[in-house]
From Swiss-Prot:
SUPFAM superfamilies found in the cross-reference section: Peptidyl-tRNA hydrolase-like (SSF53178)
The protein's name in its UniProt record: Peptidyl-tRNA hydrolase
UniProt organism field: Chloroflexus aggregans (strain MD-66 / DSM 9485)
Sequence positions that bind tRNA: Y14, Y64, N66, N113
Record CDD domains: PTH
Alphabetic keyword roster: Cytoplasm, Hydrolase, RNA-binding, tRNA-binding
Function: Hydrolyzes ribosome-free peptidyl-tRNAs (with 1 or more amino acids incorporated), which drop off the ribosome during protein synthesis, or as a result of ribosome stalling.
One Pfam family linked to the record: Pept_tRNA_hydro
EC numbers: 3.1.1.29
Keyword flag Transcription regulation: no
Top EC category: hydrolase
Primary site of residence: cytoplasm
Subcellular location: Cytoplasm
Gene name linked to the record: pth
Amino acid sequence: MWLIVGLGNPGERYARTRHNIGFRSVETLAERHGLTFRNQRAKSEIAEGIIRGQRVALVKPQTYMNLSGQAVAALRQWYKIDPARELLVIYDDLDLPFAKLRLRERGSAGTHNGMRSIVGQLGTTEFPRLRIGIGQPPGQMDAADYVLSRFTPEEEAVLPEVLARVADAVEVVVSEGLTAAMNRYNPL
């Protein structure tokens, strides 16, 4: 069983923002595999099903970004998963250029408050993550304002391709393993 968590903020106000690229990623996966999100448990929308022969739960925590760990910790208990082997968190990263993907087995939360919450609630940094580059804020723009801003029209035009690559990478993670996915998608 894989718990695939896309980070974001609930509500229409945040739907198309940079910070919600994690939500859009799991939505792309759900659409590709004919899965439907429902409010089911642990303050999360969940779409359960099979991807490449593996049971998955695609998750959009509805706790707001800074409290994502509450939902992830509750779902870890519900599904009885081992985070090091059965959890993948997908989220935005300011430190990567726009559209760049980076898979890792583990790591610090960095400056990402959603990841800080998850690490704090799980009590470990030992779980896989897929970071999606959103680039740096322009000029003197505050990072908090930037992540809550929408993508430019030029970036939005490229996002379907980026989200398709994210979905492809997740499919490889669940079917062939994290190392295979890292070898295939990190160099791009």
